[in-house]
Swiss-Prot record:
Species, as recorded: Oryza sativa subsp. indica
Gene Ontology CC: nucleus
Main location: nucleus
The protein, known as: Zinc-finger homeodomain protein 5
NCBIfam families per UniProt: homeo_ZF_HD, ZF_HD_prot_N
Example GO BP: regulation of developmental process
Amino acid sequence: MELSEHEEDAGDVGGGCSSPPTPPHRVLTSAAPETIRCRYHECLRNHAAASGGHVVDGCGEFMPASTEEPLACAACGCHRSFHRRDPSPGRAGAARLLQLHLPASINSRAPPALLLPPAAAASKQGLPFPGYGTPSGGTGTTTASSSDERLRPSPVQPRRRSRTTFTREQKEQMLAFAERVGWRIQRQEEATVEHFCAQVGVRRQALKVWMHNNKHSFKQKQQQENRQEQQQ
């Protein structure tokens, strides 16, 4: 009888202090983040950006140069950031992880275009890449002919030779000297020519060119004057 009363008291005490059992919490366990291994494909570096064109080196895949320089490509020498990057095949979780963190409006789009660099995405869709179309960096289309014209160096303009001018007195003295030597400078007359050039103030080459250019005109003029004198 005493045992039963003790059990009842214990039951009353337990009933006053105890609280209703809390339901077990559902622990959400997330899978360990999967490491995303990226592959770097062809090199997209524009080697003709300075001239306004678009020329790539043709490197098809990034290969580390050495352990000391792992970010330099052994094939083309460019930095790894110039190569097109995408996750390795079979890593569907990486694409899924990217879609979970993007808004719904962006998730509705095709994921491959989001994973590609702007230059690669533009080349796949056939769109002009900004910065290569127009000189101001717009989105204008660039034809092959315009690219060739930009890459083709402009022809070098020949330097125009300055024309030597003579005074009236110099022309008269050169005419008299040319008639005296027969409009031709002989080798044995080099000393005479040098003395005349120093006296008149002209260069030897300028005197020679003047005699060559005016030889026929002065001869024709002299012949006409002789004919007129004979007719009179």
